[in-house]
């Protein structure tokens, strides 16, 4: 369905069921904005991407597409895209989620246009391809800022290059319950990432859990971030360009082949890190003596084959706090995952016990 006249689609209640089939089809398409405040909305698209000769770019099927912004204030949304390069929500302007129950599933691979040929499940090297020549599956994508203020959000993406939630600008999470299972980055921002609240669980089977191409600021919320084996991370800031992770609050578990080393000169909340075996269903616990500071349950869909990592390369001591530790990577050790925890109650220079299943270590 395409908006007319004002170019804006507004849904304030009722039941909306849309199913479309065909290459690069759109369920809801607005030349302006899409605003949802209530209602039961189900959109399914089935159809792969295509190369548009006139625009000289790839186009893919999308459940909700807006040339302007997308704002969701409530309602129940179930969005499924099965074609290559398909997306749940995609907009050119900002995306704001204030409330609502949102479920997004994409199950197609990457669509690519290479040397005049179309590939519906491309698995080759994409480094030399212009962004207009490829379309990766995305659960939720915005070319502008992404702000999540609440709601229950579950995103599942399957296929090469499939990301969960992506902002091409700044991504901010203030509240909400968010679960993302993805192949590529679970949550990605092209600029800075701010996590100020919410309950967040992300699992990436072939890349980073949380990936910021700017700084990653964590000041609140409960976060469980799982990446794959080295060099991928549970949390990854763009250290090559001088960016870092900065802790000022919140409760975080990050597991991967490595993790970005927090910038201790700006962080006011310490962290601990070490290398240990992590398996689905494990409880990871951090203790100070007999006092439990934090406990996390590893998701059932986390694979122990994700763990690995190379030699440590610790740039900061395992119990680094504000002002302690210099630059360097927080890589994993041999035979285990890199595990990083930050939470209230940590003191710089103190030792703690970290356990995962039956294994235990002092950090």
Regions found by a protein language model. Give the residues of each.
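A composition-driven surface/loop motif
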Residues: 1-363
């Amino acid at each position: 369905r395409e908006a007319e006249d004002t170019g804006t689609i507004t849904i304030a209640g009722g039941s909306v069921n849309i199913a479309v089939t065909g290459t690069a089809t759109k369920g809801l398409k607005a030349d302006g904005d899409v605003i949802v405040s209530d209602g039961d909305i189900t959109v399914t698209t089935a159809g792969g991407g295509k190369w548009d000769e006139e625009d000289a770019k790839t186009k893919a099927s999308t459940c909700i597409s807006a040339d302007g912004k997308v704002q969701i204030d409530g309602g129940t949304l179930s969005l499924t895209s099965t074609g290559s390069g398909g997306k749940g929500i995609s907009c050119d302007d900002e995306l704001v989620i204030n409330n609502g129950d949102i479920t997004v599933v994409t199950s197609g691979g990457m669509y690519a246009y290479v040397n005049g040929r179309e590939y519906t499940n491309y698995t080759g090297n994409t480094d030399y391809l212009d962004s207009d020549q490829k379309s990766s599956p995305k659960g939720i994508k915005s070319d502008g800022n992404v702000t999540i203020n609440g709601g229950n959000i579950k995103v599942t993406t399957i296929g090469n290059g499939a990301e969960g939630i992506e902002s091409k600008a700044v991504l901010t999470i203030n509240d909400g319950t968010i679960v993302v299972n993805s192949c590529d980055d679970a949550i990605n921002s092209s600029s800075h990432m701010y996590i100020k609240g919410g309950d967040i669980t992300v699992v990436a089977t072939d890349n980073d859990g949380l990936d910021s191409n700017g700084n990653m600021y964590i000041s609140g919320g409960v976060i469980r971030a799982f990446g794959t084996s080295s060099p991928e991370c549970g949390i990854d800031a763009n250290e090559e360009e001088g960016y870092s992770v900065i802790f000022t609050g919140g409760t975080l578990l990050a597991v991967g082949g490595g993790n970005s080393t927090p910038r201790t000169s700006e962080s006011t909340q310490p962290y601990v890190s070490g290398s240990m075996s992590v398996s689905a269903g494990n409880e990871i616990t951090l203790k100070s003596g007999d006092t439990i500071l934090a406990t996390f349950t590893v998701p059932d869909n986390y694979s122990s084959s994700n763990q690995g990592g190379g030699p440590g390369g610790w740039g900061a001591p395992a119990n680094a706090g504000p002002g302690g530790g210099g630059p360097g990577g927080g890589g994993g050790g041999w035979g285990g995952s890199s595990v990083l925890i930050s939470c209230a109650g940590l003191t710089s220079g103190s030792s703690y016990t970290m356990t995962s299943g039956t294994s235990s270590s002092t950090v």
